[in-house]
Regions:
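Conserved N-terminal phosphate-binding loop of PLP-dependent enzymes in the Aspartate aminotransferase
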Residues: 1-127
């Protein structure tokens, strides 16, 4: 392949790995991911529209439902309104059907996690 074994690409990869290790990003992702999942699960007990919260590390999904018993998916209109409110708060999530996918950067701070959870809470509060 054209760039296989290219020394410039290899040097860039090694530098990226060095920076990842220097910043201890794996440990940060584990700690912030635990905070994110805790915050999202607290929102689940507050908002009936949250049918489920799933996550591992810094990747999480929030399922939106009309009824928590039947798990009927929330309508596109409701998802869109919540999504717009979250974005207006300065937080980007990915809407995928009736799910919000949250996958922040590995360098996220505790304050950023709080901002994400607060923005999502505001989004759900409009319903």
């Amino acid at each position: 392949y054209t760039n296989s074994g290219n020394p410039v690409g290899a040097a860039a990869a090694l530098a990226a790995l060095d920076e990842t290790n220097k910043l201890n990003l794996a440990s940060n992702a584990k700690a912030r991911g635990a905070e994110l999942n805790l915050g999202l699960n607290k929102l689940k007990s507050k908002h009936r529209i949250i049918g489920d919260v799933r996550g591992k590390g810094l990747m999480a999904a929030v399922e939106l439902v009309e009824d928590p018993e039947t798990k009927k998916p929330a309508s596109k209109d409701v998802v869109s309104k919540i999504y717009k409110t979250i974005c207006d708060e300065g937080v980007l999530v990915r809407a995928s059907g009736n799910n919000f996918i949250i996958s922040p950067s590995l360098i996220i701070t505790k304050d950023h996690v709080n901002k994400i959870v607060t923005a999502i809470d505001k989004g759900f509060s409009i319903i």
